[in-house]
Amino acid sequence: DGGSASEVFELTVSPVNDAPILTEIGDQVTDEDIDFDIELSASDVDIDENDQSLTYSASSSDESLVLVSTETLGDGGTGTLTLDVQDDRNGSAEVTVTVSDSQGRTLDSETFTLTVTAVNDSPILTEIGDQVTNEDEDFSIVITGTDVDVETDGQSLVFSAVSNDESLVMVSTTSGDSTGSGVLTFDVQDNQNGVVSIAVTIIDSDGGSASEVFELTVSPVNDAPILTEI
């Protein structure tokens, strides 16, 4: 018979906060002692509709290796991740970056691996200072140096020395072990006096080096006369 009836009603779709989506970062590699920044970005369908903003945060699994901090740039979903690599440290750490919206109830996070590659650090030669001795008197002094790589990389340290006037003073060195100590010996030539420059160098197993130049003053000493045989 084709009889019918109809009714119109309204369906209200309530808004639900959507989680932001963090753009993939990927694993990172850097050399020891080098800090760097990574640009962060994320998207959120609610930003334009609900006037939301995004905030970044980050954490490191090993703060003795790398410290992390973030800065949010405006409301457009961009930011900066700063990786502060600690001095003379190498290895790997897991870094977790999180982005949250202004409602604070939804977030997205990503974890990546930061690998810090070891770099040879040059040794440091302990200051020696100028020296004074008398004519005809040989002597020795202890010389020392340090190297942050000695314990971690099993490095050894070797000393060498050069005199700019071997007619006045000749020099030689004896290197110790990996503790970075040695002996510098001065062979003062007979009946000679004056001032000579001595250059001392410390070298590690990977070729890193440090040098210092100092002066040795040889003071004259009165020599007794020699009577010719009669």
Feature names for model-found ranges:
Residues 34-40, 77-79, 90-96, 137-143, ...:
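Short, solvent-exposed loop/turn segments enriched in Ser/Thr/Gly
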Residues 1-3, 100-106, 202-208:
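Short, solvent-exposed loop/turn segments at the edges of extracellular beta-sandwich modules
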Residues 60, 74, 101, 163, ...:
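Acidic surface patches and DE-rich sequence motifs
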Residues 3-5, 9, 18-64, 86, ...:
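Extracellular ectodomain surface segments
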Residues 63-86, 95-96, 167-189, 198-199:
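Strand-loop-strand motifs at the edges of beta-sheets in extracellular beta-sandwich domains
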